[in-house]
C-alpha cells in the first residue's frame, strides 16, 4: 500500500470517528459512522475503504471500551464494497442519484446487521435502534421482526444521508484536489 | 473512556500481546457458551483479570456505565416482554426462558467489556508499538493504529472550532430535525475538505522521516516475550478452538 493511501485511510478513519461528534452536537437520530469509509471507497478504492471500515470499528471499540460490537465490522466491509461499486457507476455525481443508492445500501446493511443484533445481542444494541426495537416489541411484534424493522429503517435513513453527504463533498472538491485522486477523477 | 493505567502487576510487565490475548480469549469463549453458568464464569474470569492487574476500580465504573443500559434493555425485551412460561418476580411477571437468554447475552457483554477495559488499562501504547515493531509488523498497520489515535483529538478540536465559527456566522443548530439536517452540511464540508487538502503535506512529512524506506525498524527497548507467555498464548488458542469445536458439534 502506498504512503499516500495510508494517509487517506487515516483521514477516512478520523472522519468516521469525528462526524459522530458533529451529529451528536446537532442531536440528530443518526450514526453517520461510515462517511469516511464511503468517501475513501470513491476516492481510492475498495481495499482502502475496507481497511478504513475495519480500523474504525477497532478504534471505536478502543475509544468507547465496548468491544462487544466488533462483530458489526462485517457491515463496514459491505459498505466499502457497495460504495466502491456505486462510485464506479457514477452514483455520487448528483445528490439525487446518491440518495437512492444510499437507500439501497441501508436495506442491505440493515438486513445484514439485524441477524447479528438478534442472535448475538438479543436486539439490545445502540441507542436509536434499541429504542425502536423496544417500542415495536412493546406493541406485540415478535422480537426478530422488531429487530429487523428497526435495523433496516434506521440504516436506510443513515446511509441515505451518508451517501448524499459524500456526494456533496465530492462535488465541492476543487479541481486541483480532485486531480490528485485518480480513482475519482 | 479508559486508557493505560500505570502499574506494576504481572500483566503490566508482560508482553503487550499477553493481556490482549487474554481479553480476546474471553470474547471468543463468551460467544462459544450459550448457557448462563459458563458465560458468568467468563465474567468472573474477566473480574479476576482486572483484580490481578490492580485496575479493578478504574475498570468497574466504565464497565458498569457501558453494560447497565444494555442489561436493562435485555431485561425488558426478554424478561418482561419475553415468551411464556412466566413466573412472578416481585411485582413483575418475568419470562423464564427470556431471563435465561438475558443472563447469557448480558453476561457476554459484561465479560467482554470488563476483559478489554482491563487489557487497555495494562497495555502501554508505546510498549505495544515496540512489541509490534520487534515482531516485524509492517509500518502501515502500526501507523494506522497509533497515528490515528494521535490525530483524533486535533481533528475533534477542529470540528469544535468549525462549529463555533459557523454559529458566529449565524448558523442555527437547534430547531426542527430538518433544520438540524441542513446544519450538517456547513459543518462537515469544511472539516473534510480541509483535511483532504492537507493529505499531500502529511505524505511529504512522512517521506522525509523515512516511512517508505522499507527497512525493518529496530525498537530501542522491546518488551521481553518469555517462553512461558508464548506457551500461555498458545494455550489460549487451543482452549478457544476446543470450545468452539464443542459448540459447533453441540457438545456444550
List where the protein language model places each region.
Chain A
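Membrane-embedded alpha-helical segments of multi-pass membrane proteins
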Residues: 31-39, 73-78, 160
Amino acid at each position: 500500500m502506498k504512503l499516500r493511501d495510508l494517509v487517506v485511510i487515516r483521514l477516512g478513519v478520523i472522519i468516521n470517528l469525528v462526524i459522530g461528534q458533529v451529529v451528536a452536537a446537532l442531536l440528530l437520530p443518526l450514526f453517520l459512522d461510515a462517511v469516511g469509509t464511503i468517501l475513501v471507497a470513491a476516492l481510492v478504492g475498495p481495499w482502502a475503504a475496507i481497511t478504513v471500515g475495519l480500523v474504525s470499528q477497532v478504534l471505536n471499540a478502543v475509544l468507547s471500551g465496548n468491544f462487544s460490537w466488533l462483530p458489526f465490522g462485517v457491515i463496514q466491509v459491505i459498505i466499502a464494497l457497495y460504495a466502491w461499486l456505486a462510485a464506479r457507476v457514477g452514483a455520487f455525481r448528483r445528490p439525487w442519484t446518491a440518495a437512492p443508492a444510499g437507500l439501497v445500501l441501508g436495506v442491505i446493511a440493515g438486513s445484514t446487521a439485524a441477524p447479528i443484533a438478534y442472535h448475538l445481542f438479543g436486539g439490545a444494541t445502540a441507542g436509536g435502534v434499541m429504542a425502536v426495537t423496544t417500542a415495536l416489541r412493546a406493541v406485540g411484534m415478535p422480537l426478530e421482526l422488531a429487530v429487523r424493522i428497526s435495523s433496516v429503517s434506521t440504516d436506510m435513513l443513515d446511509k441515505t444521508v451518508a451517501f448524499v453527504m459524500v456526494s456533496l463533498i465530492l462535488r465541492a472538491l476543487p479541481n486541483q484536489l480532485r486531480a490528485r485522486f485518480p480513482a475519482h477523477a | 473512556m479508559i486508557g493505560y493505567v500505570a502499574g506494576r502487576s504481572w500483566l503490566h510487565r508482560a508482553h503487550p500481546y499477553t493481556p490482549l490475548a487474554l481479553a480476546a480469549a474471553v470474547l471468543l469463549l463468551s460467544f462459544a457458551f450459550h448457557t448462563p453458568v459458563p458465560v458468568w464464569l467468563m465474567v468472573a474470569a474477566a473480574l479476576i483479570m482486572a483484580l490481578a492487574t490492580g485496575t479493578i476500580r478504574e475498570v468497574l465504573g466504565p464497565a458498569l456505565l457501558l453494560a447497565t443500559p444494555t442489561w436493562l434493555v435485555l431485561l425488558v425485551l426478554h424478561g418482561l416482554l419475553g415468551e411464556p412460561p412466566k413466573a412472578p418476580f416481585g411485582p413483575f411477571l418475568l419470562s423464564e426462558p427470556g431471563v435465561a437468554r438475558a443472563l447469557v447475552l448480558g453476561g457476554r457483554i459484561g465479560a467482554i467489556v470488563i476483559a478489554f477495559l482491563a487489557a487497555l488499562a495494562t497495555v502501554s501504547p508505546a510498549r505495544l508499538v515496540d512489541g509490534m515493531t520487534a515482531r516485524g509488523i509492517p509500518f502501515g498497520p502500526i501507523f494506522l493504529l497509533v497515528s490515528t489515535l494521535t490525530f483524533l483529538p486535533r481533528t475533534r478540536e477542529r470540528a469544535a472550532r468549525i462549529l463555533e465559527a459557523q454559529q458566529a456566522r449565524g448558523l442555527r443548530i437547534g430547531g426542527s430535525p430538518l433544520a438540524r439536517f441542513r446544519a450538517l452540511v456547513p459543518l462537515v464540508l469544511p472539516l473534510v475538505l480541509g483535511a483532504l487538502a492537507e493529505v499531500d503535506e502529511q505524505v511529504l512529512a512522512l517521506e522525509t522521516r523515512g516511512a517508505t524506506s522499507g527497512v525493518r525498524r529496530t525498537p530501542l527497548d522491546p518488551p521481553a516475550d518469555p517462553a512461558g507467555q508464548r506457551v500461555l498464548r498458545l494455550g489460549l488458542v487451543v482452549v478457544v478452538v476446543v470450545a468452539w469445536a464443542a459448540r459447533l458439534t453441540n457438545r456444550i
